Design a protein with these regions (language model features):
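Soluble, non-transmembrane alpha-helical interaction regions
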Residues: 1-176
Length: 176
């Protein structure tokens, strides 16, 4: 939060017409996105969804590993967007549409959809490996949107949830 506010104070004396809202909006969007993604994974009642480590070490480890990897996936996707956004702006972008292409246009170099360096695919692979290694079978460990799924099907579902939340975070942060 402090870094965002400090950067905004230094760099955004006169905010641009597109691609930026405010430090407060950016911080709120990031925090809400993380809360929403956690609810997507564990459902609305986090208290009953979390598996305690004392009675069920394996279930607890499964949830912790997957949550950590899902958060890494969100970070990788957001980092790809930010890098693409910087390149597009440096290239003279004059509209929010050009920034939107950094999310879903695989023809835009560096976009999330492009994943030219394979960082997103690598993290999705790590997610699937973690599910197989730490959560076999996951059972009721993830009672949210992807409930009752396992293996790569669970991984694909979690990846879709991350993609959705990352897009919502970007839309809120950048007003696009």
């Amino acid at each position: 939060k402090n870094k965002t506010t400090t950067d905004a104070t230094k760099s955004c004396v006169t905010p641009p017409d597109f691609g930026y809202t405010s430090a407060a909006t950016i911080n709120a969007a990031a925090a809400q996105g993380e809360v929403d993604l956690t609810a997507d994974i564990f459902g609305p009642d986090l208290g009953s969804a979390v598996i305690g480590c004392n009675p069920n070490k394996a279930g607890c480890a499964c949830q912790q590993k997957i949550l950590k990897t899902v958060e890494q996936l969100a970070s990788v996707k957001l980092a790809a967007f930010v890098k693409c956004k910087k390149a597009v702006l440096a290239g003279g972008a004059t509209s929010a549409e050009r920034l939107r292409e950094c999310v879903s246009d695989d023809g835009t170099p560096g976009s999330i959809a492009d994943d030219a360096k394979g960082k997103i695919a690598k993290t999705v692979g790590a997610l699937n490996a973690a599910i197989t290694k730490s959560c076999n079978p996951p059972g009721s460990a993830f009672p949210g949107t992807c409930t009752s799924l396992s293996g790569s099907t669970l991984g694909a579902c979690l990846d879709r949830q991350v993609e959705c939340r990352v897009c919502q975070i970007i839309n809120e942060m950048d007003g696009i």
